[in-house]
Regions:
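N-terminal intrinsically disordered/low-complexity leader segments
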Residues: 1-13
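Short terminal interaction segments
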Residues: 151-159
Length: 159
């Protein structure tokens, strides 16, 4: 029986969704798309398997959400680092170097690197292949914009 002062906090659907993606990332990183069971993900996060399908529809949709989150984490980190590094220098080489070091930091979370590898391994599936391609394109474009490397250096006007 709960005491009068007991407070029960309920997660919002978005918080629960984020928790499921985090749990799925760990499972998919280790076992891959084909080798991961939705039951293992549900158990890891403490929800029912039907609830996973209520949130994501299919296992593939959940995998794609985890892949998207992985790439978005890297992309946002690069953009943040580039903004901070730009205070010291707006040289594209400097900014790219700082983003490269940030990537090494991101990869200390082995699940991030493993999930990226598992995403590539799952590219036999056309939907997953399209998502991986789109995420890499967004990442490339983001790095190019954030670093200024997308534009050739302009020569001074000789006039």
């Amino acid at each position: 029986m709960r005491g009068v002062n007991a407070v029960q906090t309920r997660q919002t659907a978005e918080e629960r969704r984020e928790g499921v993606i985090a749990a799925a990332t760990k499972e998919f990183a280790v076992h891959g798309f084909a080798g991961t069971s939705t039951m293992a993900i549900a158990k890891r996060v403490g929800v029912s398997q039907p609830y996973l399908f209520q949130l994501f529809g299919t296992k593939k949709d959940l995998f794609i959400a985890a892949v998207h989150e992985c790439f978005e984490t890297v992309r946002l980190r690069f953009e943040s680092v580039a903004r901070d590094a730009r205070r010291a220098s707006d040289d594209p080489e400097h900014l790219l170097q700082q983003m490269g070091m940030a990537y090494c930091d991101v990869l200390t979370d082995r699940n991030m690197l493993r999930l990226q590898m598992q995403a590539y391994a799952a590219c036999d599936d056309a939907d997953i292949r399209r998502v991986v391609h789109d995420e890499w394109t967004k990442l490339y474009d983001s790095v190019a914009r954030a670093s200024g490397a997308e534009h050739p250096r302009r020569l001074p006007d000789p006039r």
